[in-house]
């Protein structure tokens, strides 16, 4: 109900929560929120808060008019990932170093919800221009070159103007950026384990039980493959929460024997489509339907996480459920 200019000048920041099963992509590979540099333009798909969590992100007093109800992110992507995934590239039409402008026209498929028409962007000596595996000068940009980019803020942001923060000139540079991010993501998940949602718990009469869980989607395929290939050795399962933090997970976990591994095609957004049933001789308190856990492959090396990534008390766990606005 507010003109864009009014919202831009007077509205508050768009506070949002990342859903635990939300998926993040950067440079064409799975990522964590920490991987995306501040100031990066991103494409997001947002949902209404889950039932019972409507107050997680409350409206700021006296600014209710600007409150965005769709404030739980299920998907975040930088421009590189967004356009690449949808089959849209860009062709250089012209570059004006003096005026700091680059004209691009879309190539390939037309990306829905993105820029899909010829466009002029800001570009300057601070923009990172990648060719092969190194940075080059603006003069290396030639008309007719097929490129990918990431965008950032520009002075005319309110009027949909953007600056090019990074530009990839060839396939080698793009593949290198993607593989580097993929390796970073794989290392991160192996250290912290794959997140999953508990679907069902069958409690035994004298301790232990069977836990059925579904692994979240958006992870590199190699991680799921390693779990599947070593399932006969059992999985470590540590209790987590919606922030995906754990306790001292290398110790506060139980090993479950895999009874069943089931995969379904075309899973809903946020799901891997992989459901696993595990038998435990003991169950942790966090093994409850609807709760979140993190799952470790037997062959992954134990790594102790820094204290700021761990829960240390039940009070801290409780506080993490509420987003505190500055």
What are these regions (language model features)?
Residues 1-326:
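Short, flexible, surface-exposed loop segments at domain boundaries
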